[in-house]
């Protein structure tokens, strides 16, 4: 429903408490900062992610995906929708004829299987992704090779943050 009344005090903060059951917001200052490599979790050779929100109650994760060398990332299938926004560099899927360049928004529909490639002339790619559900890694014939979901992402974060001295609990700030 559109707003039908005029707010006479638009710069006055809401005066009532938030619901007791509401979880706190997440604010990640300077999320694109390259100043601390410990914040980037290794996922594969030359592939890293920076967690922003790991939602265990709804089964999705939001992260920055960084690739520091050209090449094939992975072939995978999504049973749920994925949203992406390219912040740096570019990439494409072998199965499609478009290229996601810096500033591009990408919607991947449920059921999509694709092979992500960073072109040879790209030194670094960073994309903001929201992945809902799970990613199934497959071979060219669709044979299951592995999977990732919000819980495997959390475990990867715990191990990495412990190893680099931030402590396994560092990941808790991103979990909702």
What positions do the PLM features span?
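A short, N-terminal "cap"/entry segment at the start of jelly-roll beta-barrel domains
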Residues: 1-59, 159-176
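Conserved hydrophobic/aromatic beta-strand scaffold that supports enzyme active sites
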Residues: 49-51, 62-64, 83, 105-107, ...
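Active-site region of the double-stranded beta-helix
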Residues: 51-58, 71, 77-81
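Beta-strand-enriched cores of mature, soluble protein domains
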Residues: 63, 69, 80, 106-107, ...
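Short histidine-centered beta-strand/loop micro-motifs
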Residues: 63-65, 73-78, 95-98, 117-119
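Short, conserved beta-strand element in jelly-roll/cupin
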Residues: 66-68, 76-93, 130-132
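Short acidic-glycine-tyrosine-enriched beta hairpin
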Residues: 91-115
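Double-stranded beta-helix
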Residues: 121-176
